[in-house]
Amino acid sequence: MNPIISAASVIAAGLAVGLASIGPGIGQGTAAGQAVEGIARQPEAEDKIRGTLLLSLAFMEALTIYGLVVALALLFANPFV
């Protein structure tokens, strides 16, 4: 295997995981903060807010998992070789 392609694949895998986790991390923090604020304002709506929060957190976490899948594909099933 060409060492330049191997090095570029490792760097790309690291960037894929790193960049794929920045957006969802910020989004999850914002969503959790807004959920806590909403529950503090309307405690009677806690169940509905918590359910919506957990569903949206799962969708945001899926984006990070996609980045991990791309990184694993670059590391173990390198299409550039």
Curated annotation (Swiss-Prot):
GO cellular component terms given for this protein: chloroplast thylakoid membrane; proton-transporting ATP synthase complex; proton-transporting two-sector ATPase complex, proton-transporting domain
Membrane topology: Multi-pass membrane protein
One MF term in the entry's GO annotations: proton-transporting ATP synthase activity, rotational mechanism
Annotated protein name in UniProt: ATP synthase subunit c, chloroplastic
Main location: plastid
Database matches in InterPro entries: ATP_synth_csu_bac/chlpt, ATP_synth_F0_csu, ATP_synth_F0_csu_DDCD_BS, ATP_synth_F0_csu_sf, ATPase_proteolipid_c-like_dom, F/V-ATP_Csub_sf
Keyword tags: ATP synthesis, CF(0), Chloroplast, Hydrogen ion transport, Ion transport, Lipid-binding, Membrane, Plastid, Thylakoid, Transmembrane, Transmembrane helix, Transport
Protein species of origin: Cicer arietinum
Function, as annotated: F(1)F(0) ATP synthase produces ATP from ADP in the presence of a proton or sodium gradient. F-type ATPases consist of two structural domains, F(1) containing the extramembraneous catalytic core and F(0) containing the membrane proton channel, linked together by a central stalk and a peripheral stalk. During catalysis, ATP synthesis in the catalytic domain of F(1) is coupled via a rotary mechanism of the central stalk subunits to proton translocation. Key component of the F(0) channel; it plays a direct role in translocation across the membrane. A homomeric c-ring of between 10-14 subunits forms the central stalk rotor element with the F(1) delta and epsilon subunits.
Cell location: Plastid, Chloroplast thylakoid membrane
Gene3D superfamilies assigned to the protein according to its UniProt record, in alphabetical order: F1F0 ATP synthase subunit C
Site feature: Reversibly protonated during proton transport: E61
Other facts: In plastids the F-type ATPase is also known as CF(1)CF(0).
Family from the record: Belongs to the ATPase C chain family.
Domain of life: Eukaryota
Subunit (UniProt): F-type ATPases have 2 components, F(1) - the catalytic core - and F(0) - the membrane proton channel. F(1) has five subunits: alpha(3), beta(3), gamma(1), delta(1), epsilon(1). F(0) has four main subunits: a(1), b(1), b'(1) and c(10-14). The alpha and beta chains form an alternating ring which encloses part of the gamma chain. F(1) is attached to F(0) by a central stalk formed by the gamma and epsilon chains, while a peripheral stalk is formed by the delta, b and b' chains.
TM ranges: 3-23, 57-77
